[in-house]
Amino acid sequence: MSENLFGLTVAADKGLDDLQCQRLLSENRRYQEVMLQYRCALKALESRLEILNEEFSLQHDRNPIESMKSRLKSPSSIMNKMQKRGLSLDFPTMQANIMDIAGVRVICSFEEDVFFLAKCLKDQSDIEIITEKDYISHPKPNGYRSLHLTIRLPVFFAEKEIHVPVEIQLRTIAMDFWASLEHTIRYKKNLPINAEIETELKECADSSREWDSKMEQLLHILT
């Protein structure tokens, strides 16, 4: 069998866990080179967001960003996603088709801050918007709200410029509170979710939407 995405076809067949895969990957130079691109893309995006945050703070005397959290998809998650989609397990295929290897979650103070930051990023001439999914204006049936952007931005190395995809999730504190606890209830407990609990979760999502609306109204009254 030909070498797979991480040179780990045999390892994957043996069912090695993610930590064991990481140890093997630490010796795989090609993997390290590719992941460096995604790590640097995260740093570049975080730097742009920090600049926007500081500029907004200077102009409006408050920060639109409460916190940021970045992550790289694990090797096993990447491989599983590619296998489910029937993709060839090699680096060019991975880079052309898997757009969420690098991800940033941005927690904002108010709903209007989410759209402000999204617009600022979209207005930057060297950023390409791959996809945009507005689950704030159009929440998912379960009540989930967030703004998802998949972008491609340039990363400058010593001898080359590479445009790397990054997934961005922008949401308010209330949206993140609901999404985090809903995920814990739905997935971490590994228990079936009945219709009554689904209804309760949706009602909580509706309440969080009301909180965002009321807080934004208060902000405008006081400013």
Question: Where are the regions a protein language model picked out?
Answer:
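Long beta-strand-rich cores associated with HINT superfamily self-processing modules
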Residues: 95, 108-215
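Solvent-exposed loop and beta-edge segments used for protein-protein assembly and interaction
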Residues: 41, 98-100, 143
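Generic solvent-exposed, charged/amphipathic alpha-helical segments
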Residues: 42, 46, 50, 79, ...
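Glycine-rich, low-complexity intrinsically disordered segments
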Residues: 14, 33-37, 64-68, 94-95, ...
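Generic alpha-helical secondary structure
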Residues: 34, 38, 42, 75, ...
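Terminal, regulation- and interaction-focused segments at domain boundaries
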Residues: 101-107
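A glycine-rich, hydrophobic loop/mini-helix early in the fold
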Residues: 55, 60-101
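An acidic, glycine-/histidine-flanked metal-binding catalytic module
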Residues: 2-42, 46-55, 166-223
